[in-house]
Regions:
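Activation targets extended, charge/polar-rich intrinsically disordered C-terminal tails
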Residues: 107-294, 298, 309-313, 320-353
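A general structural signal for short secondary-structure boundary/capping elements
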Residues: 74-78, 90, 136
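A conserved acidic, glycine/proline-rich C-terminal tail/linker
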Residues: 303-306
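Extracellular structured ligand-interaction cores
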Residues: 26, 39, 88-90, 126
Length: 353
């Protein structure tokens, strides 16, 4: 059934929550046609917890997400309960374009069409909405962004949201992300984050027109959630570890078991990163240069210590150097540097001995 001439389409942007999976906010599309009593929200961020082997598929990047549909009031209840902010951007679309968007969403909501293979950077709850809005205008290159915000890589967009309060989560993300995360994003690519899509839409207009695509922007809900407390910075923790190891090294009191523990833990981390690269479908964890310093080679060095071949020790020291340059060049968490320096120091002692 086609919509009336007064139907409107909006992009809903939801602010972050206090759980990690809500840190980056959320996006949805609202279709409101008061003449026909329609007020629906389409949400590409849902998944089925009853999926067999749910957590295993989630870890391996093989969990299908799906399009959900709910009433507008039902959608808002969750955000009222958790005290999360919600903004609405009413789109400047013709009645035909609103109807096109509605029909595409309804087709996409059919059971055989609603599932999709989630990708954190390239295919998520925000990018799906971005692409559906573009398609409703006729084809995919009808939007021009006049956005004057910063040009960032995928990694920097993500870690920017975590700085100051979720530094340990930022460190974890910098450990997991590989070279694909260091791609410099275009305006369109930057819209993978809901709040960034909100900001870019504010300065976006359809090709061939002078007016913006957003007719009106209102805040439906204020933020009422409790602010996150600042965590103890990981860079301080690992700097203290480095200082302690340096003092023990200077006094020649570093026990063998401590070296073995240090090297084995780093090597096991490297094996985990290799699994995330080769054993999963996650695009963002491929070509992870953290494997250069968290190297499985360190497990072999841990077994042999002073009896390790010189070539292996020199190779590992070279890998440390390359990894350190990558950490600085790409703006990874500075907490990684004291970790790398600790390993450099202890492998250097083995070389000297």
């Amino acid at each position: 059934m086609p919509l009336s001439q007064t139907a409107v389409a909006s992009v809903l942007t939801c602010g972050p929550g206090n759980d990690f999976y809500t840190t980056f906010g959320h996006s949805a599309i609202r279709i409101c046609d008061t003449a026909q009593g329609i007020d629906l929200v389409y949400n590409y961020g849902t998944f089925d917890f009853d999926t067999p082997h749910f957590y295993w598929k989630f870890m391996r990047g093989q969990l299908d997400y799906m399009l959900g549909r709910s009433s507008f009031n039902g959608f808002m209840e969750e955000y009222i309960y958790y005290g999360r902010a919600v903004w609405e951007q009413r789109l400047h679309l013709s009645p035909q374009e609103v109807n096109n968007l509605y029909l595409m969403l309804e087709w996409n909501y059919q059971p055989e069409n609603r599932y999709y293979h989630y990708d954190f950077f390239r295919d998520n709850c925000a990018t799906r909405i971005r692409d559906m809005v573009r398609l409703s205008l006729g084809h995919t290159d009808t939007l021009i962004a006049d956005y004057e915000g910063p040009v960032r890589t995928y990694r920097r967009w993500v870690t920017h949201e975590l700085e100051g309060t979720l530094e340990w989560w930022r460190l974890g993300i910098d450990l997991l992300f590989g070279l694909p995360a260091d791609h410099r994003c275009t305006d369109v690519e930057s819209m993978f984050l809901p709040i960034v899509m909100h900001d870019i839409y504010a300065g976006t207009y359809p090709k061939g027109t002078d007016g913006p695509i957003v007719d009106e922007s209102v805040q439906l809900l204020p933020e009422k959630r409790a602010p996150l407390s600042r965590s103890f910075p990981p860079v301080v923790v690992f700097a203290l570890v480095f200082v302690a190891v340096a003092l023990l090294t200077w006094k020649r009191k570093m026990p063998c078991w401590a070296d073995r523990t240090l090297f084995i833990l780093a090597g096991l981390l490297g094996l985990a990163l290799l699994f995330m690269w080769f054993g999963t479908d996650h695009y963002c964890t491929e070509w992870n240069l953290n494997i250069l310093w968290a190297s499985p080679l360190l497990i072999l060095i841990a077994i042999r210590l002073e009896r390790s071949p010189k070539w292996a020790l020199w190779l590992q020291e070279g890998c440390f150097a390359v990894a350190a340059v990558w950490v600085v060049w790409c703006g990874l968490s500075m907490a990684l540097l004291p970790l790398i320096l600790t390993l450099v120091l202890r492998v250097g002692v083995l070389l000297k001995n």
